[in-house]
Regions:
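Cofactor-binding beta-sheet edge motifs in enzyme active sites
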Residues: 2-175, 179-424
Length: 424
């Protein structure tokens, strides 16, 4: 994580580019650790006052937030958009609060500038919302888990339009919380608290639920923030005459495992062995457009662009297969790397179709150009909204102040997971 800090255009990048041009050779500059702390964009310096209103049934009716946000010494790329726009939208959380008022005063100080960095305003918004929910539960004498359950957006209410711009696409917050409570043995906590007290220790348990907006991608959002940029992603899928595949993606990998996950997408989609798939990224001489890796967007946006390009490859392959198999295009099915005439055993492998595309002796020239190489762009209309519930159980020695995290439980809904090992 933390790749949002790479969005910002640092002065050193411009100087290194200039130096490389002057010297006509590669130039590399790397900040030392102390230099990074003094110059990299950072995040989360807020002073916040929050009020939560509830009715007689312990239902949330209003949330009011007054916030002072430190922007640092000068503006960065998305500086004000993070502690103002995104912070305000994340104050909804997973709850049905009908009225939300957020006022943020942004101030300049003598610190480094702020930008998107590890959550881009979601951690601080989640902290204040979950903290005030706990305070409300304590004041009402309610179980904090029950107060949350009572105010969650119902699973059958999606898509759910929040009062602060965002429309949530899906979610099942009751289930993620229930799973976390069961895994943490929440019901048995009081017995563990008494046992800790018998040893002279203090034991506490805390719950936090969250919503996050992944895939920083809808270009309309960039426009709303005043950024003159598109946030789409591009992909090119090139099937070679041998049947091997090269994918050129604008989502640059630097430790996320794109080479594995993107190759897995292609292997599943085209029925090609994973060892015959090459993933190319980070080369501006080969890749026309790329918006990058940040904002939890690579698989959902970059991966979807790859899927859309594969769909075009399959669509063209069906036309070629229909011509070769003397069948209607509507009767051609594609599965596991084979183009088959529906209801028959007549088929052509993807490799055969690719070879025909590049050696087009028996080819529908009136309908198609030779080659099997397709490009796609993907600009989603909305974010995706993963969610979850985390529970921490801690023990404190009141004599020394030493704190021990006895158990930490997390239940997260990430939607469809392509590669579980990378998630782990």
């Amino acid at each position: 994580g933390g790749f949002g800090s790479k969005i910002y255009h640092y002065a050193e990048e411009a100087i290194v580019t200039w130096a490389a041009g002057k010297l006509r050779r590669p130039v590399k500059w790397t900040a030392e650790r102390s230099e990074s702390f003094l110059s990299d964009a950072q995040a989360r310096d807020h002073v916040t006052h929050v009020e939560l209103g509830l009715d007689d049934n312990a239902k949330f009716v209003a949330l009011k937030v007054s916030n002072i946000a430190n922007l640092g010494g000068y503006l960065s790329t998305f500086s004000t958009g993070i502690p103002i726009y995104l912070f305000g939208t994340f104050c909804v959380g997973p709850y049905t609060t009908p009225a939300i008022y957020v006022e943020t005063k942004a101030v300049f100080t003598n610190t480094v500038p702020v930008d998107a960095y590890r959550g881009a305003s979601a951690p601080e918004a989640t902290f204040l919302v979950e903290r005030i929910v706990d305070l409300a539960a304590d004041e009402l004498g309610m179980d904090p888990a029950e107060l949350r359950r009572r105010n969650f957006i119902p699973a059958d209410a999606f898509p759910y339009q929040t009062p602060v711009a965002l429309q949530y696409d899906s979610g099942d917050y009751q289930t993620t919380l229930r799973m976390a409570l069961e895994a943490a043995d929440y019901a048995g906590f009081e017995a563990r608290r008494r046992e800790a007290a018998s040893r002279g220790k203090l034991r506490g348990i805390g719950i936090a639920t969250y919503i996050y907006a992944c895939i920083m991608a809808p270009s309309a959002v960039a426009g709303a923030l005043g950024a003159r940029a598109g946030l789409f992603e591009s992909a090119e899928v090139r099937v070679h005459p041998t049947g091997s595949v090269t994918v050129l993606t604008g989502s640059h990998a630097h430790g996320q495992g794109h080479e594995t996950t993107f190759a897995q997408l292609v292997a599943d989609g085209l029925g090609v062995p994973i060892e015959q798939i090459e993933i190319v990224h980070g080369d501006t001489n080969k890749i026309a457009f790329g918006m990058g890796t940040y904002g939890s967007r690579s698989l959902a946006v970059g991966g979807t662009a790859i899927v859309k390009a594969m769909d075009k490859v399959v669509a063209k392959g069906k036309k070629i297969a229909a011509h070769q198999l003397e069948a209607s295009e509507a009767d051609i099915e594609f599965k596991d790397g084979q183009f088959t005439v529906a209801g028959t055993d007549r088929s052509k492998a993807l490799g055969e179709i690719a070879l025909t595309a590049y050696v087009p002796h028996n080819f529908p020239h009136d309908e198609l150009e030779p080659g099997l190489d397709e490009t796609a762009f993907y600009d989603p209309k909305n974010f995706t909204f993963p969610s979850g519930a985390h529970i921490a159980e801690v023990e404190i020695d009141p004599e020394t102040g030493r704190l021990e995290i006895v158990k930490f439980t997390a239940s997260d809904d990430f939607g469809r997971i392509i590669n579980p090992m990378i998630v782990e």
